[in-house]
């Protein structure tokens, strides 16, 4: 069944991270540029996939990539925190709600995203799997802006501190696998295997493009 497009909430794909733990042959690699499935990069895979669910998908990054897509450029060159991308997105897009997702979480199902986007009476609605909170798979409301401004001003870049002190709620999901974060090469290889199994029809029916 075709996924209905989410028209009223833009999706911002957070791709401004450092990839410091993603190492191949002792060299840190920008994981956004790692190939995935039939796509030349994780960035293109995520962008293309999310466009099937959201009418508007924007990439938040330190720089533009070769991929032809709308970008929100983070101006804080030497500082790495998703809070910069989130803050910049609200200031630029001027919209009440924004769904944020990290580039390195390519297995999150459309069904889970739709559940998160359907709960709109909190400043932040984020996913929680059996073992971990996933603050960067989340729906944010502009009411967070004052607290976000203060957080950046005081240089407390801990995402958990901001969210726990805000009007937030965690939505619990049972499947750990779909929230796999590609921090390392081993994580990436596991995701490749999971997507391959999905393509063979054994699982993940609603999660691949």
Curated annotation (Swiss-Prot):
EC category: transferase
Superkingdom, taxonomy of origin: Bacteria
Keyword Cytoplasm: yes
Keywords: Cytoplasm, GTP-binding, Magnesium, Metal-binding, Molybdenum cofactor biosynthesis, Nucleotide-binding, Transferase
Binding annotation for Mg(2+): 104
One GO BP annotation of this record: bis(molybdopterin guanine dinucleotide)molybdenum biosynthetic process
Residue numbers binding GTP: 14-16, 31, 104
Catalytic reactions of this protein: Mo-molybdopterin + GTP + H(+) = Mo-molybdopterin guanine dinucleotide + diphosphate
GO molecular function, one term: GTP binding
Co-factor(s): Mg(2+)
Gene Ontology, cellular component aspect: cytoplasm
Pfam family, one: NTP_transf_3
The keyword Metal-binding is assigned to this record: yes
Subcellular location: Cytoplasm
Alphabetized InterPro entries for the sequence: MobA-like_NTP_Trfase (IPR025877), Molybde_CF_guanTrfase (IPR013482), Nucleotide-diphossugar_trans (IPR029044)
Domain comment quoted from the record: The N-terminal domain determines nucleotide recognition and specific binding, while the C-terminal domain determines the specific binding to the target protein.
Function: Transfers a GMP moiety from GTP to Mo-molybdopterin (Mo-MPT) cofactor (Moco or molybdenum cofactor) to form Mo-molybdopterin guanine dinucleotide (Mo-MGD) cofactor.
Quaternary structure and partners: Monomer.
Homology family: Belongs to the MobA family.
Protein name from the UniProt record: Molybdenum cofactor guanylyltransferase
Organism in which the protein naturally occurs: Helicobacter pylori (strain J99 / ATCC 700824) (Campylobacter pylori J99)
Gene name for this UniProt entry: mobA
